[in-house]
């Protein structure tokens, strides 16, 4: 619930702000044909800058910066960074520009962390996207680990970490699900 409250403003695409030379856009839909991914960005800040891109209905050029909101604190692994980099690649593809950095904002510790979008991170995201598509093509459900934070995640009902502790075949999964319904 707390994460939902945190995202209420960030997830509302109708709330747009302009303060001085910064336009803030929320809940922007993005996709990448290159990665085969799509998603919704929490916040994109467009800063007036000659190195930026033109925006329809706005004078000058605007440099986009993504701000991804997280309820908790920085993780010991790269999952938040990978998400931000994937979002960046999607936005770059749509706008036809290069984005050098983005931000992760961690609510519980009130920390806005600048993340450089490096070529190594871009390669990692491309590799992970490729692996994801391979799982899909092979009709496999990847294993997921259950952590106490899983219940706070907006994707817990899709990921189902308690049920997917090992890689499984989709056809077998559906068969087992239907089989258990037949016994009711």
Segment roles from a protein language model:
Residues 1-66, 178-184:
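Metal-dependent nuclease catalytic cores that hydrolyze phosphodiester bonds in DNA/RNA
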Residues 33, 40, 85, 102, ...:
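Surface-exposed loop/turn and secondary-structure junction residues enriched for glycine/proline
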Residues 140-184:
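Cysteine-cluster motifs in flexible loop/terminal segments that predominantly coordinate metals
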Residues 38-39, 45-138, 151, 157:
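Nucleic-acid nuclease catalytic cores
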Residues 4-7, 122, 126-129, 133, ...:
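Generic detector of well-ordered alpha-helical segments enriched in charged/polar residues
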Residues 1, 77, 86, 118, ...:
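Short, structured coil/loop segments at alpha-helix boundaries
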Residues 1, 99-108, 166-177:
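Short alpha-helical "patches" and their helix-cap loops
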């Amino acid at each position: 619930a707390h994460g939902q409250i945190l995202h209420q403003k960030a997830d509302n695409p109708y709330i747009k702000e302009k303060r001085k030379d910064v336009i803030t856009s929320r809940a922007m839909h993005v996709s990448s044909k290159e990665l085969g991914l799509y998603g919704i960005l929490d916040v994109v800040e467009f800063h007036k800058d000659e190195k930026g891109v033109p925006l329809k209905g706005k004078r000058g050029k605007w440099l986009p910066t993504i701000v991804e909101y997280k309820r908790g604190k920085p993780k010991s692994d790269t999952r938040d960074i990978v998400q931000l980099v994937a979002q960046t690649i999607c936005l770059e593809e749509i706008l036809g520009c290069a984005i050098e950095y983005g931000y992760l904002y961690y609510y519980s510790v009130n920390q806005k962390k600048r993340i450089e979008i490096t070529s190594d991170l871009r390669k990692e995201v491309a590799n992970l996207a490729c692996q994801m598509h391979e799982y899909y093509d092979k009709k496999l459900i990847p294993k997921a680990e259950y952590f106490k934070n899983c219940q706070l995640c907006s994707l817990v009902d899709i990921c189902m970490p308690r049920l997917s502790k090992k890689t499984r075949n989709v056809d077998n999964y559906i068969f087992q699900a239907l089989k258990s319904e037949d016994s009711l």
